Amino acid sequence: MTTMTEPDTRPLIRVVAGIILNKHGDYLLSSRPEGKPYAGYWEFAGGKVEAGETEFQALQREFEEELGIRIRRAVPWLTKIHSYEHARVHLRFMRVEAGWWTGELQAREGQAWSWQKAGDFTVSPMLPANGPLLKALSVPRSFTGRPDTGLEGENASGAYRVVPFGLAEPQHKHILIDETVLRARGRMPEAESVWVRIQTASQWPRVQDADVVLWQVGNREAAEAVCGVLAGGVSMPLVVAAAPEWNASYRRRWLDAGAHAVLACEETEAV
């Protein structure tokens, strides 16, 4: 068993899990069957990537074996590394929209399953690695507004407002702060979630503690850098805010590579 003070040097086991949506925008959770570690805990279904498989092939196989559904398409979303008592795992979560899977759900391993709303999950206990994931799922995938004046979205719990740090008041739950301002300040603002805005690839390593990263794209170098970062896997939702010409050219590439959302907006001042 690995302790908190010792680095976990066990080999990484590659695991893929599916964020399956239905036509109502609900997410599929299932319980772990008897005989497996954490039996009875709820999770996003999936399993180990076998030798010779791609992550997508493993996802297809696991969902057909466990729940009887066939996945035709999936896109990457978040990547997590988590140490359990029994294993150290590299978790790749993939989004599967309502029209990308077919079949009737079946509990082929005796597990329970449930459709849940992002931000309003009602089943427990949840697998330990899924805590940050559930919070990330509550971030809307579309917004109106501008980073320097505020962004408005909606999830299952209602309105979701992101307020610039310079305009934030104590009651605001979601705060957006520029990485340069955060670095000068030396600590994260107090908030339910902190969004950090960056504009260059050199800033990316410094924002790994953010709940959400907003990447402002104003040139081709930044647009390509977003593609590179997504290809390597991101551990938090990455929202891209791009000038119109870069939005038109790269939007589909970013979303297919795992961007959480893409906004069309011009350059803005630090927030």
What residue ranges belong to the model's regions?
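A short coil-to-beta-strand element that immediately follows conserved catalytic motifs
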Residues: 70-79
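Conserved N-terminal beta-strand and adjoining loop/helix that marks the start
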Residues: 2-27, 48, 79
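Short loop-to-alpha-helix "cap/lid" segments that border enzyme active sites
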Residues: 152-156, 169-260, 265-271
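Conserved Nudix-box catalytic region and its N-terminal flanking loop in Nudix hydrolases
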Residues: 26-65, 78, 195
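Conserved hydrophobic/aromatic beta-strand scaffold that supports enzyme active sites
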Residues: 19, 29, 91-95, 115
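Nudix hydrolase/Nudix homology domain
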Residues: 103-162, 264, 269-271
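Active-site-adjacent beta-strand/loop module that shapes the phosphate/pyrophosphate-binding cleft
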Residues: 80-104, 119, 130
